[in-house]
Amino acid sequence: MTPLRILISNDDGVLAEGVRCLAAAAASRGHKVTVVCPDHERSATGHGLTIHTPIRAERVDELYGPGVTAWSCSGTPADCVKLALSELLAEKPDLVLSGVNHGPNLGTDVFCSGTVAAAMEGTLEGLPALAVSVACFQWRDFQAAAELAMDVAENALADNWPNNLLLNLNIPPCHPEQMGSLRWTRLSIRHYEEQFSRRVDPHSRTYFWLAGEVVKDLETAGDGPRDWPSDVAQIETNSPSLTPIQPDLFWRGDLSALPAACVANQPVR
């Protein structure tokens, strides 16, 4: 295919092996790659933006291989993409990629994900965008995930990539020969048992570490094709999951079920 201009970001930081592997995979296919990533890990920052302190960026091409321009940015993942599109790139990219994330981004966890937020920032700017994650925090072989992400992105661009569509790709922690087939999936709803570890610092001030674990994965976060598995169920079969996401969060349920009292007897203005 014609070489693409690709912007890559993440939330694990510019030194993370996952993003370096993804950048190398894109560059090896002849694409023009620019990496703009946080200067340190910014996991679970969601779509947060930096508005009260300056954002700084510096070139770090030496961290990446040939054909990759790289920037280290002091901001959040969403900041990185915003800054790249507004200030750092000479031309608008054809594609925004985010990842490869060191850990899953499944179900309603996408609302907390810096990885998904970086891709969503591209979607909000009218660009095709894909987030890619390996569904295990301990897995360190990102080559298969990077290559599959590139295959999915290139195929989607060659076929039909609708406006306002973000593709969220999760890949099981196994080698390609052990992996099942890629399928379209729906978002699950993840419920956690929230836990806070209470501690005391040397100045006798109490502080907390947030912890917790998934206690329940519901089948779906909303209506959708019934023959599509949830993303969590797909990963549990050692098969990659591809979930279409959009920025429009409008309620798609029964409008007659909305609490009518909210707007009853309100004066017309």
Swiss-Prot record:
Q: Which SUPFAM superfamilies match?
A: SurE-like
Protein's UniProt keywords contain Metal-binding: yes
GO CC terms, sorted: cytoplasm
Per UniProt, the keywords (alphabetical) are: Cytoplasm, Hydrolase, Metal-binding, Nucleotide-binding
Cofactor note text: Binds 1 divalent metal cation per subunit.
> What Gene3D superfamilies does the database record attribute to this sequence?
Survival protein SurE-like phosphatase/nucleotidase
Name the needed cofactors. Answer: a divalent metal cation
Reactions it catalyzes: a ribonucleoside 5'-phosphate + H2O = a ribonucleoside + phosphate
- Main EC class of this protein? hydrolase
Question: Where does it localize?
Answer: Cytoplasm
Q: Which residues bind a divalent metal cation?
A: D11, D12, S43, N101
Instruction: Give the superkingdom in one word.
Output: Bacteria
Name the Enzyme Commission number(s) assigned to this protein.
3.1.3.5
Q: Name one GO molecular function term.
A: 5'-nucleotidase activity
Pfam families documented for this protein: SurE (PF01975)
> Predominant location of this chain?
cytoplasm
Q: Which family does it belong to?
A: Belongs to the SurE nucleotidase family.
Q: What does this protein do?
A: Nucleotidase that shows phosphatase activity on nucleoside 5'-monophosphates.
User: Any idea what this protein is called?
Assistant: 5'-nucleotidase SurE
Q: Which organism is it from?
A: Prochlorococcus marinus (strain MIT 9303)
Q: Which gene encodes it?
A: surE
